Amino acid sequence: MVIFFRKYKSKIALMVFICVLFCAVSCLLDFKTLGKQKMPGLEKKSVFMAAENTVAKNTDKDVNEPRLHAVSVALYDADDETFIYGKNMRDSMANASTTKILTCIVALEKADINDTVTISQNAASQPEVKLGLVAGNSYNMKDLLYGMMLESFNDCAYAIAEHVGGSTEGFAKLMNEKANEIGCLGTYFITPNGLDAENDISFHHSTAGDLCVIMSYCAWKSPKSTQFLEITQTMQYTFETKEGQMVFSNHNRLLKETDYCISGKTGFTTKAGYCYVAAVEKDGRRMCLSLLGCGWPNNKNYKWADAKSLVEYAVSDAAEDSYCDAACVTTQQTGDTRNTINLKYIENNKKNKKICKNFLKNFTINIGNFF
């Protein structure tokens, strides 16, 4: 019997481990609602979440859910670091110029806003929409950042990327490192301007959930958040160049039409459709929203309607009732082993309207000795 156990010890351990995971997932499937829960990306060592973040789909609540055009949607509470609403929010999607949100914060954190940037032929040759930078000429980093974030100029994004990263490839590496650092494991960027691209690894993409976390970091958590907000809240920006005076206008309509939007970035490519990511502050709450594939020509205004619907939903009673129970599995590095598994069961805590705050069970299985 002892010989048999030793011979098959590793297989037995594997079977036990699989059974434990199966039980965790099985418990999850019994929950009646799936909705607002901690984003796994915020735990950098997360392996996977046992459930997709979606609003509970039952007859009573369907009536109150926002009616949206976007293919992929996320609504995020930046203070609780939880999701209020999700629709296909973990799907890998082309995200167009919303990429420039991360381009901007990486540039602000890695370079001086008063740097002088010399324009390459590569940057000058970027397609519309563009400022019309002249190869060989020099521009101020600050002016390029405003051009990129207010007017979404593609040549400005490339000029910034080459200056900060040494090349667009080098800058893409910095972007992906930052995304990973803040927990956005569903994001992979290739271009600094968000134009569709692919390489041997993957295609240029993010998720609605990740983009909310990226915007939350940029607006409130980065050491350069103040500069980021100053740029993205500016309605009009004027500066002088060798080519004459330049005037940039902000295309974020929610800044003009609401009193709660504090930052945002639009985007469009044929593949991505119309996209929009925003940071808002309403009724004492700090939130981010993300809309991907929100219509194609001639439906340019869908994103504004969807954004407003999401914000109204966020402060409604319907959103307060959409919390859920959830189970998750995460890795934890303990000592010299990376084979420690944490299983956490999280109970709905409706009494104080907070979710994923109380761990009823938090037990650890160290499988490092079995494999």
Which residues are covered by each model-predicted region?
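N-terminal Sec-pathway targeting helices
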Residues: 1-18
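Active-site-adjacent loops and short helices of periplasmic peptidoglycan-processing enzymes
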Residues: 2, 31-209, 219-221
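Domain-terminus/edge residues, biased toward the C-terminal soluble/receptor-binding domains
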Residues: 9, 29, 184-185, 200-371
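Enrichment for repetitive, rod-forming helical segments
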Residues: 13-18, 22, 107, 364
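Hydrophobic alpha-helical membrane-insertion segments, chiefly the h-region
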Residues: 20-30
